[in-house]
Each structure stands twice: as structure tokens, then as C-alpha cells.
């Protein structure tokens, strides 16, 4: 099997990292401050794993858990539609774990930053813990 790597054929991880870097710069330009990138919770024998792409802090103190999704086009609903129930549950699990570091957790929300081609769509409060 032949695999192609290089500038024209970036790996899925490289593409994801580039999308997260683009999303981070875009959010910072809108006043959000990075708290942590790629926060991971390991999968255990009785627990789901999870990862939060970006943990940001809004100017009002709200902790913003950001899922970055990239798609080349809007087929199958585009990037935003790819954050379904299972993915939301993994994000919620990781966020609950992250919030354990606070004696009094700050207000928080779950955003999706959808990169479809050259466009960026910011879905603030895309879902909540009751979803």
C-alpha cells in the first residue's frame, strides 16, 4: 500500500491540527483566551474517553468548551451536523472531568466551530448538559 504524505497530502491528524490552529486564532481575534488545548480524558474499564479541542475563557468569565469540526463541503449536513449525540456525550464527560479542578465551577457553555471550506460558522451554546 502506498501512502502519500507531504504538502499536498496532509494526514488527517495534520489537517485536524491545522483546523484547530485556525479556529484558535479566529476565536482569539474575537476576544476569547485559551485555557487549554486538546484536553483528554482516558477511556477506562467503566468510563468513556473524551477530548475537548479547545477550552477557552470568554471576556465575561464563561468557560467555553469548543469542538472544532472541519469538512471540505456541506454534504451530509456539513461540519456542524457531525456533532451528534455520542460526540456530545463524550464532550460532556470530558467537561465534567475538567471542571473538577474548580471548587466553584464557572459558568460554561459548549460551542461548535464549524469550518466548511473557507467559511467559519460559530455555533455558540450549540448544546447543553441536558441534550
Tell where the protein language model's regions lie, with residue ranges.
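Short, low-complexity, polybasic intrinsically disordered segments
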Residues: 118-131
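A short, glycine/Asx- and small/polar-enriched loop/turn
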Residues: 46-51
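Short, solvent-exposed loop/turn elements at beta->coil junctions and helix N-caps
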Residues: 38-45, 111
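Catalytic cores of nucleic-acid endonucleases
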Residues: 2, 70-118
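Acidic-basic catalytic patches of nuclease active cores, encompassing PD-(D/E)XK
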Residues: 1-41
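Anionic group-transfer/hydrolysis microenvironments
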Residues: 38, 53-55, 69, 113, ...
